[in-house]
Amino acid sequence: VTLAFATSCCLSGVVFGWPALAVALKREGAFSSKCADDDDACKSQEVALARVFTIGVLCMFGARLPVGLALDRLGARVTVVITLLGAAIGALLFAANNYAVGFALITGCANGVHVGSMHLAQLFPGKEGSVTTIFNGAHQMGSLVFLAFLGIYGSGASLPAIFRGYAACLAGFALLHGCVIQPP
């Protein structure tokens, strides 16, 4: 349950941390090619960043049905591992400046981790509500991931390096869930 909680904290609610990530993306110069040299508040850049966020939110909500179908057909272990690997690929794409597709994969796959861990509450008869609430809290804590990234970025790390590290972390979680922890 501790690993599932940590994994959920690292992925399931990240979409809600977008404002901090948008700050880092602006500093990194994402979509700055759409701006004039003398344009401090570039509307085209804002629109492009808002589009990435919108795509991410749509993927987060749109992925719920496919995740549910995967849980029914493949089981929790396979679903969680696949979605963690999908999110890791998304992080690598994000690191390669493919922001929309990367963010879509990260946020779309986040549901698999969150929903795929809920069944663990059944391991604690009489405490199912408490465990489910803990996982929902982990989902909310996921919004702090990009805030942490902004702090790391502010101390000198590049955004691509941060997202490559994030991809490695998610792949490590996939390995742990698939081979060690997650019951079928």
Across the structure, where does each feature detected by a protein language model lie?
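Central cavity-lining transmembrane alpha-helices of secondary-active solute carriers
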Residues: 46, 50-69
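Symmetry-related core transmembrane helices of the 12-TM Major Facilitator Superfamily/SLC fold
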Residues: 160-180
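Extracytoplasmic
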Residues: 2-39, 64
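Conserved MFS/SLC helix-loop-helix module at the cytosolic interface between two early adjacent transmembrane helices
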Residues: 62-97
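Hydrophobic core of transmembrane alpha-helices in multi-pass small-molecule transporters
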Residues: 90, 97-113
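Hydrophobic alpha-helical transmembrane and interfacial-helix anchor sites in secondary transporters
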Residues: 25, 70, 152-153
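Intracellular juxtamembrane helix-capping segments at the cytosolic ends
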Residues: 25, 110-134
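Transmembrane alpha-helical cores of Major Facilitator Superfamily
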Residues: 9, 51-58, 104, 133-141
